Swiss-Prot record:
PANTHER family: TRNA MODIFICATION GTPASE GTPBP3, TRNA MODIFICATION GTPASE GTPBP3, MITOCHONDRIAL. The lineage of its organism: Bacteria, Pseudomonadati, Pseudomonadota, Alphaproteobacteria, Rickettsiales. It is an enzyme of class 3 (hydrolase). This is tRNA modification GTPase MnmE. It comes from the Bacteria. Belongs to the TRAFAC class TrmE-Era-EngA-EngB-Septin-like GTPase superfamily. TrmE GTPase family.
Length: 445
């Protein structure tokens, strides 16, 4: 196995920069850079880092050596903690590149080596990637649960039950003259039935984990000049959308990213929806607004209190569902006692974006819907499409299984099911999918 290195911390100005080296020559490289021969594992040393060829002092650094297998990768690992400057990073990288039999690591290669050395399964490796990319508390909680092995426990439990069925059936394939006892048949059928139900229910999760990973799309829609762009600016706490009294100012979708209650929200301000527009560009904007709302996870439909009754049309009300927040804006311009017909059919929030009236209720409603769609449950979720793909395949073969079929064919259905589950965690030969997973990591991880 080659020795690899990379800067594990971000490149640029910082308090500390961390360089990681992994492989059989790690300790030798550390000795070469410091001139010190003896290093006790897992003990930090304060050492001068000297470029071997030029004898130039690069930095005074903290260094540590991890002896295999007690390291992140399961190999000999060295970490060098220097001051975080671009100049030091460039000098360190160039110095390491000039040492023979050591090369720059590929993206995710340290984590890939850890997986290959049985430090964790593929789901935990993906959890580490999600942890690095997490931007909100809920994304962090999901990632840390996955990185800690919760998904591995679930999938391994299913796979163990499948292997038990295989072992029971293969015993009777080897002895075809023997009748399978009723107790064994009942055991196999009950286990099979339970697994079908568990995996079916698990797949029927409304993509909660994937939504949390990618972010919940929230579209703000409604007639022109209802305050949609002002609401977007309020939620983003900065002016990213142009606000004007002229109808049709917003022509295209304006997007922003927000953290509400720990949930990642992708906000989209859209063109005002009206029926009488003759402007071709505005018509395209309206079309995009409706399409955006139809594909959104959460919708805010916004009306102007002074023009509400005249601005309601089926293009707008047809978008309302259980994950929609209906807002009547500009309530400061009407009598508080005024009642609207739409309030008889839908729960509406009365607000004034301009005067900051009841805006906290909007945030709370968004958070409640997000929690309902992607909030935590006791069982960890499917977090990416790769898992879902293999689970669907597994369920398909599991559903095909029947003891009324030829026993060899029935056993093969269970074997393929177990193989699909194993492909998720990496307990089978999955070299063809490793590149796809680890290429999404950053260099140095």
């Amino acid at each position: 196995m080659e020795t690899i290195f990379a800067q594990s911390s971000a490149f640029g100005k910082a308090g500390v920069a961390v360089f990681r080296i992994s492989g059989p020559k790690s300790l030798e490289v550390l000795q070469l850079l410091t001139g010190k021969k003896a290093f006790k594992p897992r003990l930090m040393y304060y050492q001068q880092i000297i470029a071997p060829e030029t004898k130039e002092l690069i930095d005074n650094a903290m260094v540590v050596y991890f002896k295999l297998p007690n390291s992140f990768t399961g190999e000999d690992v060295v970490e060098i903690h220097t001051h975080g400057s671009k100049a030091i990073s460039i000098m360190m990288i160039n110095t390491l590149l000039n040492i023979s039999d050591i090369r720059l690591a590929e993206a995710g290669e340290f984590t890939k080596r850890a997986f290959l050395n049985n430090k964790f399964d593929l789901t935990a490796a993906e959890g580490i990637a999600d942890l690095i990319n997490a931007e909100t508390i809920m994304q962090h909680r999901q990632a840390i649960r996955q990185a800690s092995g919760r998904l591995e426990e679930l999938y391994n439990s299913w796979r163990s039950q499948l292997l038990k069925i295989i072992s029971l059936l293969e015993a009777y394939i080897d002895f075809p003259d023997e009748d399978i006892p009723d107790s064994v048949l009942n055991d196999v059928n009950n286990t099979h039935k339970n697994l079908v139900n568990e995996i079916s229910n698990y797949l029927n999760d409304n993509r909660r984990g994937e939504l949390l990973n990618s972010g919940l799309k929230l579209a703000i829609v409604g007639p022109p000049n209802t305050g949609k762009s002002s609401l977007l600016n309020f939620l983003m706490q900065r002016d990213i959308a142009m606000v004007s009294n002229i109808a049709g100012t917003t022509r295209d979708i304006i997007e922003g990213h927000l953290d509400i209650g720990g949930y990642p929200i992708i906000l989209q301000d859209t063109a005002g929806i009206r029926e009488e527009s003759s402007d071709i560009i505005e018509q395209e904007g309206i079309k995009r607004a409706i399409n955006s709302a139809k594909t959104a996870d959460i919708k805010i439909i916004m009306f102007d209190a002074k023009k509400l009754d005249s601005s309601i049309n089926e293009d707008i009300t047809g978008l309302i569902d259980e994950n929609t927040i209906v807002i009547i804006n500009k309530i400061d311009l009407i009598e508080p006692s005024k009642v609207f017909s739409i309030e008889d059919k839908y729960k509406c929030l009365r607000v004034s974006v301009k005067n900051n009236i009841a805006l906290s209720s909007i945030l709370k409603n968004i958070e409640n819907i997000a929690e309902n769609m992607a909030g935590f449950t006791e069982t960890p979720y499917i977090t990416n499409q790769r898992h879902r793909h293999y689970l669907k395949q597994a369920l398909s073969h599991l559903t095909d299984f029947s003891l009324d079929n030829d026993l060899v064919l029935a056993t093969e259905d269970i074997r393929i099911t177990a193989r699909c589950i194993g492909a998720i965690t990496g307990v089978i030969n999955v070299e063809e999918i490793l590149g796809e997973i680890f290429q999404n990591f950053c260099i140095g991880k």
